[in-house]
Amino acid sequence: MKLYLSSYKIGNKPEVLKKWIREHNNKICLIPNSRDVYPDGERKTNGIQADAQELTDLGFDVTVISLKDYFNKKEELSQILESFSAFFVIGGNTFVLRQAMYLSGFDNFLKTKENDPNFLYAGYSAGICVLAKDLHGLDVCDDPNVNPYGIDTMWNGLGYYDYIFLPHYKSDHKETKLIDDSVEYCNKHNIKYKTLRDGDVILDDTNRELER
């Protein structure tokens, strides 16, 4: 599974995504559930549409799928997701996103694609933070107690990294001060982390030895 990990929005490697379209296809599924931390309304909808438009401008044919529509319908969701080879997971609240991935079975679906080089997981902010093995340290910048789905906070991430990502570091972003606080907290508590400035993109893949 190829990974395109951005601090904010598309980031500074759009040519990588354009190359993906040329070599594969332009279908992409946008996952918006980190935004379930916010109430439904025009502002939330407009934000999701703005993310979708950025992908459209690159040449993608975007389908927005809310994992919330498939809670306790894991088989149905898996069948739908099989028609996509690329996903874009947007920013919001990491803990809410993790819960949505669990309740819908999206996390288990990803596991079936780990060794597939023709599968792309792209995302930014919460969409990359959720990839860590353990989410402790992210609670400084994301509220872990927000509970839109009625289940307990999940501190285990997807398990692809043994450190957390801290996006928006030293950036022109409203959360950059919270990221500074997160860095301080992680240093104090010996939590491993990697900072990204807005614009930064990390390219990686999961076809390697992973510690669960």
What are these regions (language model features)?
Residues 27-29:
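Conserved beta-strand elements of the Class I
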